[in-house]
């Protein structure tokens, strides 16, 4: 190796190595002081990109968890409010059940209805005031609300909370057939009871025998109510057109084949002979007699079999010739508010044939609060004739007098009850029946309007497949103020409870979904943060070793550089 003065190669090498080591020492000190392995893109370009992506994902997941907790807060608020509404509905149903017995007077039923009205007001108040951050929850406007619960857009959970006002819940379907006057074997099928399948019931005989009639059919329907969702009730009742007048039955007078014989009775059945004679055989006939508040004879089938009068019960009874065979009205109830679609054979025997007038209506909880309209009342199975209503007869006569004079009416000359007999039966008849003798009176009686498809000249004079309100039915008083109304309110309240339970079940399902999602993304967030830490954070043990190495090299480099510089002094010895 030659001796040179101008260029100290050894010193230059020592400096270069010291510079490199200084950079390593600076990087090591930076990592140890920041705790990060990557402090700039130069440290690890690809690693920094990955770490930044993971950090963004973790932060977004953190906000998604917060969003999910907000969703849970909303759902829990709605759930607790609906829990209180369910308690209110339970109370309403209990009060309706309390009213559904004839031990209650109109006064006490009215008091119960007042309680129910207040409860409904509070139910609606809860529905209209329950909110979260200014958003109404139970008014029906909280539909398809989305909550972002993922790191990427459109990773959402949707929530819908149904309306819980009294006008929106409890919608119950009521359908009641026309009065049946024919017997026979009935085959009944409920179409699409579950949206897909049909349900066929066993055939039932409609007659006056024990174990037959609408009572037997209702029992058959109710056996499968849990499956079909359809329940049935019946009303087999024959009511006189006017108050009982003095009269006599014939020797062969019989009800449901059981001979009762000749009976003389007074006005209003003052001596009780007619009613007591009928009731003496009620265990055999299944028919019980009574008087209503207007003094009219009422024959009621206890078990739903038909009521058939043979012989002559007497015109004074108020029972007209075409009332002597009666198989009643069948009422069907469905708790989901949808149409009850039926088919079958001989449906006219239950008042639901193709030419029968079937009353139908869907009634909400709120509608049971006030006066029940005639449409709803008839669909619920209230008696079509009650006090101020009228029986409707189609006759080829134009007046009550002509009806009384017609052969077979029981009011013809010589009967003792004819026009001008002094018994004023024409007045009672005019109050109790309406004669339909022309298209005009048909339209007036049934309130058939133009455009309805049933106006004069439409060709639908037989009212084929007509479903509407029975003629001349009357409005009924509110809710539980009548026995029948109390029964209907029980059905409606039960439907309302089912509706709320379904809404709460949906809320519960969404709560479980959100909770599971929060649990999942919480674990994901932890794992993502761990992955980011592996890339971005410094390993202090490893970096401390690197620092020690660089520090020692820095010291040794300084020594080496000093030695390299001092080696040039050796050249001076050559010049001595």
From Swiss-Prot:
Gene deletion effect: In a double flaA-flaB deletion, cells grow faster and are non-motile, flagellar filaments are non-existent.
UniProt cross-references to InterPro entries, sorted A to Z: Flagellin, Flagellin_C, Flagellin_C_sub2, Flagellin_hook_IN_motif, Flagellin_N
Disulphide bridges, residue numbers: none
Keywords: Bacterial flagellum, Secreted
Main localization of the protein described in the UniProt heading: secreted
Induction statement: Translation is inhibited by translational regulator CsrA (at protein level).
Any one Gene Ontology molecular-function term assigned to this protein's record: structural molecule activity
Region named Required for interaction with FliS: 537-576
Compartmental location: Secreted; Bacterial flagellum
GO cellular component, one term: extracellular region
The UniProt record lists the keyword Secreted: yes
Pfam families, A to Z: Flagellin_C, Flagellin_IN, Flagellin_N
Domain of life according to the entry: Bacteria
Region (Required for interaction with FliW): 1-44
Free-text comment on this protein's domains from its UniProt entry: Interacts with FliS via its C-terminal domain (residues 537-576), interacts with FliW via its N-terminal domain (residues 1-44). May form a 3-way complex of flagellin, FliS and FliW simultaneously, in which FliS and FliW do not directly interact.
PANTHER family linked: FLAGELLIN
Binding partners and assembly: Heteromer of FlaA and FlaB. Interacts with FliW. Interacts with FliS.
Family the entry assigns: Belongs to the bacterial flagellin family.
Classification via NCBIfam families: PRK08411.1, PRK13589.1
Function per UniProt: Flagellin is the subunit protein which polymerizes to form the filaments of bacterial flagella.
UniProt-recorded name of the protein: Flagellin A
Organism whose genome encodes this protein: Campylobacter jejuni subsp. jejuni serotype O:6 (strain 81116 / NCTC 11828)
């Amino acid at each position: 190796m030659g001796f040179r003065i101008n260029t100290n190669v050894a010193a230059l090498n020592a400096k270069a190595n010291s510079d490199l080591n200084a950079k390593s020492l600076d990087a090591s000190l930076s990592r140890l002081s920041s705790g990060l392995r990557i402090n700039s893109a130069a440290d690890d370009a690809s690693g920094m990109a990955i770490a930044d992506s993971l950090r963004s994902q973790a932060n977004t997941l953190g906000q998604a968890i917060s969003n999910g907790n907000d969703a849970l807060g909303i759902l829990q608020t709605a759930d607790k409010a609906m829990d209180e509404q369910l308690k209110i509905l339970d109370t309403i149903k209990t009060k309706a059940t309390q009213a559904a017995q004839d031990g209650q007077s109109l006064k006490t039923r009215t008091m119960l209805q007042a309680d129910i009205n207040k409860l409904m007001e509070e139910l609606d108040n809860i529905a209209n005031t329950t909110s979260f951050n200014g958003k109404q929850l139970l008014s029906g406007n909280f539909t398809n609300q989305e909550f972002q619960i993922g790191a990427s857009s459109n990773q959402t959970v949707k929530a819908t909370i149904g309306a819980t006002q009294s006008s929106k819940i409890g919608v119950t379907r009521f359908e009641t057939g026309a009065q049946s006057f024919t017997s026979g074997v009935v085959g009944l099928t409920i179409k699409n009871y579950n949206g897909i399948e049909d349900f066929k019931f066993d055939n039932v005989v409609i007659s006056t025998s024990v174990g037959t009639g609408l009572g037997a059919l209702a029992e058959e329907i109710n056996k499968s109510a849990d499956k079909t969702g359809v329940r049935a009730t019946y009303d087999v009742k024959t009511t006189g057109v006017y108050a009982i007048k003095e009269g006599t039955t014939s020797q062969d007078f019989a009800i449901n084949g059981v001979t009762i014989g000749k009976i003389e009775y007074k006005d209003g059945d003052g001596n009780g002979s007619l009613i007591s004679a009928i009731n003496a055989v009620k265990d055999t006939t299944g028919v019980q007699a009574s008087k209503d508040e207007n003094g009219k004879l009422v024959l009621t089938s206890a078990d739903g079999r038909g009521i058939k009068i043979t012989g002559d019960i007497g015109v004074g009874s108020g029972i007209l010739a075409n009332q002597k065979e009666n198989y009643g009205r069948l009422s069907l109830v469905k708790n989901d508010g949808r149409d009850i679609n039926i088919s079958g054979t001989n449906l006219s025997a239950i008042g639901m044939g193709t030419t029968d007038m079937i009353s139908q209506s869907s009634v909400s909880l709120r509608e049971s609060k006030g006066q029940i309209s005639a449409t709803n009342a008839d669909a619920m199975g209230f008696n079509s004739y009650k006090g101020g209503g009228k029986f409707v007869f189609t006759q080829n006569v134009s007046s009550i007098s002509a009806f009384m004079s017609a052969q077979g009416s029981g009011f013809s000359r010589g009967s003792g009850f004819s026009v001008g007999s002094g018994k004023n039966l024409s007045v009672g008849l005019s109050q109790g029946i309406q004669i339909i003798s022309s298209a005009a009176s048909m339209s007036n009686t049934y309130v058939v309007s133009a455009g309805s498809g049933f106006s004069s000249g439409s060709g639908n004079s037989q009212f084929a497949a007509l479903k509407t309100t029975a003629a001349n039915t009357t409005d009924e008083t509110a809710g539980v103020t009548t026995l029948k109304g109390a029964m209907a309110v029980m059905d409606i309240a039960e439907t309302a409870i089912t509706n709320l339970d379904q809404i709460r079940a949906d809320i519960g399902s969404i709560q479980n979904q959100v909770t599971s999602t929060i649990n999942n993304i919480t674990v994901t967030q932890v794992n993502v943060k761990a992955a980011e830490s592996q890339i971005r954070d410094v390993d202090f043990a490893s970096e401390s070793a690197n620092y020690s190495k660089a520090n020692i090299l820095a010291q040794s480099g300084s020594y080496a550089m000093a030695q390299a510089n001092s080696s040039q002094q050796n050249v001076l010895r050559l010049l001595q």
